[in-house]
Amino acid sequence: MSPAAAAEPDGVRGDRHVSKLIFFLFVIGAILLCVGVLLSIFGFQACQYKTFPDCSMMLKIAGPACAVVGLGAVILARSRARLQQTEERLRGNNQADSDRPFLCGESRQFVQCLIFGFLFLTSGMLISVLGIWVPGCGSDWMQESLNETDTADSEPQICGFLSLQILGPLIVLVGLCFFVVAHVKKRSNLNGDQDASESEERQTQSLEPIQVTVGDAVIIFPPPPPPYFPESSASAAARSPGTDGLLPDESPPSYYSIFQSGSPTPEGQGAASERDCELIYTISGTASSSETSHTLHLLSELPPRYEEKETATTTSLSPSSEPSPP
């Protein structure tokens, strides 16, 4: 075992083995599918005429069998590729396995599209040649071509396979579409790599000081500081909506969220029922005071209590204020 392979973790090696299996299933399935289609067309289209008297029943059986096996292999490879992509998303890997370098520095999906395009293009050309150059007339086609005078009693000639002449160019067009998909996939991979390199360059440049030349003077500005709470968004997303408590590594809530939402802390959740009607007032003080504002928590029952005190004081003062009887 090479040292590079020994240094790789078991998960990466397992993913590479699965990727190779998916690739070979795709390729073998596509080859069997194309061969089966060709054998089926030749067995069911060309062998029904007397021009090919040696056509056996084996072609009519082997063609559909190869096509079905190839289609099953392609479907199995496709389902396995989707399962692997789902597993990588659960692991948190953003880059799909089909986009990684697989063969000659190219991705697996790009190589698959090239192979599919080549197979479909070759099959379409063979079918087109079979439909154009192989005559599909009866056994007496040569005799009827020589005897051009007696055409009244002769049946109309069916030379060439019209279905193959139509099906061949369609398969060629499908092969060209695979080449276009491969080109688009490569362009998207190149753009993604270029964006990643540009983001890395911007990140490295942001850590360097900025030099600004004004006339003969050169002003050097320090790099911007790192974010004060880099994990605030991640912790806020990971935290459940029902828990509003602050952890030591989380950023504090904003000023307005405290005075507007009024959500209780975990320590005071037991007394939340007693403070449902609590009102918060902010009263600005004088300039001479050390504090510029005082936050007073006034309950809804406080104004009636103040009125009771005032009435009590008035009742206590009323006997003293009345004149004494003579």
UniProtKB/Swiss-Prot annotation:
GO CC terms in record: membrane
Topology of the protein relative to the lipid bilayer: Multi-pass membrane protein
**Major subcellular site:** membrane
List the residue ranges forming a coiled coil, or say none: none
Cell location: Membrane
Q: Where is this region: Disordered?
A: 229-326
Source domain of life is Eukaryota
Keyword DNA repair among record annotations: no
Q: What is this protein called?
A: Transmembrane protein 171
Q: What is the lineage of its organism?
A: Eukaryota, Metazoa, Chordata, Craniata, Vertebrata
